[in-house]
Amino acid sequence: MAQWIMLLLLTCLGCIKGEFFTSIGQMTDLIYAEKDLVQSLKAYIQEEETKLSKIKSWAETMESLTVKSTSDPEGYLAHPVNAYKLVKRLNKEWLELENLVLEDMTKGFITNLTVQRQFFPNEEDETGAAKALMRLQDTYKLDSETISKGEFPGTKYRSTLTVDDCFGMGKTAYSDGDYYHTVLWMQQALKQHDNGEQTTISKADILDYLSYAVFQLGDLQRAIELTRRLVILDPGHERAGSNMQYFEKLLESEKESNQINKLSVNPSEPKTYNGIYERPQDYLPERETYEALCRGEGVKLTPRRQKRLFCRYHNGNRNPHLIIAPFKEEDEWDSPRIVRYYEVLSDEEIEKIKELAKPKLARATVRDPKTGVLTVANYRVSKSSWLEEEDDLVVARVNHRMEQITGLTTKTAELLQVANYGMGGQYEPHFDFSRRPFDITLRTEGNRLATFLNYMSDVEAGGATVFPDFGAAIWPKKGTAVFWYNLFRSGEGDYRTRHAACPVLVGCKWVSNKWFHERGNEFLRPCGTTEVD
C-alpha cells in the first residue's frame, strides 16, 4: 500500500516540476512529500536504534565475559568448553558483529530521498520565494522585523525567520543587484545577531554585505562606520581593509569638493525616511497608486458616487432561465461599469474545477509587447491552465451560465482559464484587450470584448483586483464573479480598464475567467451612437 501511495505522490510531483513558488495549490504537494520523508527518516532512526541496541547488548555480554577470562586466563581456558567458545567467537561471532556494524540501514531512506529530491524546489524556487516576500514587504509596507516575527494579519500559524533566513534574503537581493532590500534584510540579520540569537552566520559576513550595500545606496559615512566595525571584528579581513581605504579616499574627495563649492550637505547622501532608505524608482509609473489600492488606501469611491451604486436581481435581459432563478447583482463601480454577481459557482463546482485544473497548471505567460511572443514575466506570478467543455460537464455548465448572465455568446470566447496565485502572487497593471492592430487573433475572433472573473476562494489578506486609473479595489469573495467590458461599443479599447491582481499577502487565491470576443456578439452588443458609448 505504501509503495502505491509513494508512486501516486511521485506521479503528482512529476507533473508539477518547477516554479513551485508561483502556485500555493501546487506547493501543498510539497507538504505531503515532506511528511513522507519524515516518516521515512523515523523508520531509518528506528532501524538504527534497533541495530545499536543489538550492538550494545553484545558489548555488555562480551565485557562481563572478558572480565572473567582476563582475571585467570589459564584457568579459564582450562575448561575445554571455554576454549572452544573463544575460538568460535573469534572465528564467527565477531565476524557476525562486524557485518552487523557495517550493515547499511540508510538504504531505504537514502533511496526515498534521492527519488524525491528530483522533484524538490530548486535554487530558482528559493530565489522566487525570497523575492515574493520582498514584494509583499514593499506592497503592504511591512518592515523586515514584522516579517521576521511572522506577524501577518489573519494567519493561523506563526512562523519566524532566523538570522540565517534573513541573511539568505539579503544575499538573494544582493545577487540581483537590489541593494535596497539587501540593506533591509542584512540590518535585520545584524539586529537578531546582536540580540544573541544562535546562528552559524558570522557577524563579519553580515557587516561585509551590509557595508557594501549601504555604499551602493550612496551612504558613504555609514559605509565607513560599518566597515570599521568589520575591521575591529576581523582585522585580517582583506576586502574590508581595501574597502576602507577606498571609502576614506572618496570621503576626502567629497569634502574637498564641498569646500570648493561651499556646500554644507553631502551631495551623495541618500534620502531617508524615519531612518530607512528611500525605495528606488520603479519601472511602473503607477506603482504608488497601484500599491496603495492593494492596501485599501486611495479608493476614490466618494459618498456621491456611492449613491449611484445599487443591488438588484439580474435576469439576463429576461432570459427564461434567469427569470425563474435570477442572480444577485451588485454595482461595484459606475463608470466604467463593473458589477459583481453572487452565488455564481457552488463549492462543489469550484472544487471540481480546481481538481481538473491542478494537473495542467503551468507558469502563466504574457505577450511580449515587442515580439508578440508568449513569455513568463516577473510582473505576473501565478500558474494557470485552460479547461475545455470536453474535460467535464461542469465546465460546459459554467460556460453556459456565464453566457446566460452576460447575454454574450461563448462560441467565440476563449477557453475557461483557471489561475492559482503563489507566494506574493500577482499580475501587475495590464489591459485584457490587445493593443496590437495586426494581432492575428483580432482578424478571426476580434478583440477581447469583456472579462468575466470568478473568485473561487476567499483570501485572508491581499489579493484584490484594482483599477489604478479610477481608483477602484474589488476584494475576492468565494463563489462571486465580477464582469466588465474592455471595449467601448465602437470597438475602441477602454483604457480605464487597466487593472491588476494584487499580491496575495495571506491565503491561497484561485480564480477562473472567461474572455468574450467581438465576433458573434455584433448584434448582442451593437454599436452605440458615439465612440465612447
Predicted regions and their residues:
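Fe(II)/2-oxoglutarate oxygenase catalytic core
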Residues: 2-481, 487-533
